[in-house]
Regions:
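Bacterial N-terminal signal peptides that target proteins for export
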Residues: 1-7
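Compact, glycine-rich, soluble single-domain proteins
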Residues: 46-47, 55, 59-116, 130
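C-terminal motif of bacterial Sec signal peptides marking the signal peptidase cleavage site
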Residues: 16-17
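C-terminal partner/receptor-binding element of secreted or periplasmic proteins
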Residues: 130-161
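Terminal, regulation- and interaction-focused segments at domain boundaries
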Residues: 21-62, 157
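Beta-strand/loop substructures that line and gate deep hydrophobic ligand-binding cavities in soluble
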Residues: 113-141
Length: 161
């Protein structure tokens, strides 16, 4: 009789300790915005202008815009609502091809992408950190610091200046 009571007490203490140490639930969207692997930069421009400015700047730097994915429009076409959200897929074979030759699996990280979204806080440009892109690959930062890393600088400059 004492043994079952002790077991129940131990279980209750364990559950109580777990409940006290539990952190508040974080949604995937919140997790992405605070991740050091993802950068979120406030744009000083309206949503549509931010998308256009990024596309123009990417092309002006000799890169190709491979696709523009309008998630908001796709949602509406399916009877759903969401905030404005557009992903620009871009890059240049001159920069990406040597990296994919060195590490074929790196093709999963390319082309680069930037999300432009409208939040209650304003328009934001969201993109993956260059070091996070190469993490786990055979690519060294020195191989991308003058190519892929420049895309981060370009995005920041376009939306903040």
């Amino acid at each position: 009789m004492i043994k079952p009571a002790l077991s129940a007490l131990a279980a209750a203490a364990t559950l109580s300790a777990c409940a006290q140490n539990a952190s508040p639930e974080t949604s995937p969207a919140q997790a992405a915005t605070v991740s050091p692997r993802i950068h979120t930069v406030a744009s000083k421009y309206p949503f549509a202008e931010t998308v256009t400015r990024l596309q123009n700047a990417i092309q002006a730097k000799g890169m190709t815009v491979f696709a523009v994915i309008d998630h908001h429009a796709a949602a509406r076409q399916n009877g759903l609502e969401m905030q404005p959200a557009t992903v620009i897929v871009f890059g240049t074979p001159k920069a990406g091809t040597p990296l994919m030759v060195k590490d074929p699996a790196f093709a999963l990280q390319l082309p680069l992408r930037v999300l432009v979204t409208q939040t209650p806080e304003g328009v934001q440009a969201v993109f993956t950190d260059t070091r996070a892109l190469i993490d786990g690959s055979r690519i060294e930062y020195s191989e991308v610091e003058n190519t892929l890393a420049n895309a981060e600088k370009l995005i920041r400059a376009v939306v903040t200046q």
